[in-house]
Swiss-Prot record:
Subunit structure: Homodimer. UreD, UreF and UreG form a complex that acts as a GTP-hydrolysis-dependent molecular chaperone, activating the urease apoprotein by helping to assemble the nickel containing metallocenter of UreC. The UreE protein probably delivers the nickel.
Annotated Gene Ontology cellular component terms: cytoplasm
Family in the record: Belongs to the SIMIBI class G3E GTPase family. UreG subfamily.
Compartments reported by the entry: Cytoplasm
Record's protein name: Urease accessory protein UreG
Length: 203
């Protein structure tokens, strides 16, 4: 059985996916071997951001230019991402975590099971407190849901209690967290969640 965990990170543009990868890499790299694949339609902006932040050594971060719909690149035709993941796994074997960040997409986004072992979906409070109840695979089926930027709730008139109630109803017992990734709130809990899903830690 493979000892690594492939983790998909998806969510709308600006929700905090790249910020999540930045904080997770900085938190986990002390104890684990990590690599990252990012997706952008026409650029490698997210990959370059992580490289410039020095969250990992440059070779461990690959930017994929999908040239089209972000959803297609992680679901229907994920060959570009699969090849990037395999390249990293061959180069840095053994790895513990391989993160695959989707380009910004809508609530219908989901990862191919051929590409990742589990998925994290990130939404943010600034989109309004109705987002959880709108559902979609990202809200209901992801292995972990993050509601980010909770510090903006008052500013945008979002009620966190409503978001909590709707999220618990839509998730039906699946895990989720409120986060403020700009100051690291929630990173410890997310890291523990991921560590518990490493194949070597499974009972």
């Amino acid at each position: 059985m493979s000892s690594k965990l492939r983790v998909g990170v998806a969510g709308p543009v600006g929700s905090g996916k790249t910020a999540l990868l930045e904080t997770l890499c900085l938190s986990l790299k002390k104890n684990y071997e990590i690599a990252v694949v990012t997706n952008d339609i026409y650029t490698k902006e997210d990959a370059n951001f992580l490289i410039n932040k020095k969250v990992l050594e440059e070779g461990r971060i690959i930017g994929v230019e999908t040239g089209g719909c972000p959803h297609t690149a992680i679901r229907e035709d994920c060959s570009l991402n699969k090849n990037a993941v395999l390249d990293l796994e061959n180069k840095y074997n053994p790895l513990d975590f391989v993160f695959v960040e989707s380009g910004g997409d809508n609530l219908a986004s989901s990862f191919s099971p051929e590409l990742v072992d589990l998925s994290i979906y990130v939404i943010d409070v600034s989109a309004g407190d109705k987002i959880p109840r709108k559902g979609g695979p990202g809200i209901t089926r992801s292995d972990l849901l993050l509601i980010n930027k909770i510090d903006l709730a008052d500013m945008v008139g979002a009620d966190l209690n409503i978001m909590k109630s709707d999220t618990e109803f839509m998730r039906k017992g699946k895990p989720w967290f409120f986060t403020n990734l700009s100051i690291g709130k929630g990173v410890k809990e997310i890291s523990q969640f991921l560590e518990s899903h490493l194949p070597n830690n499974q009972n």
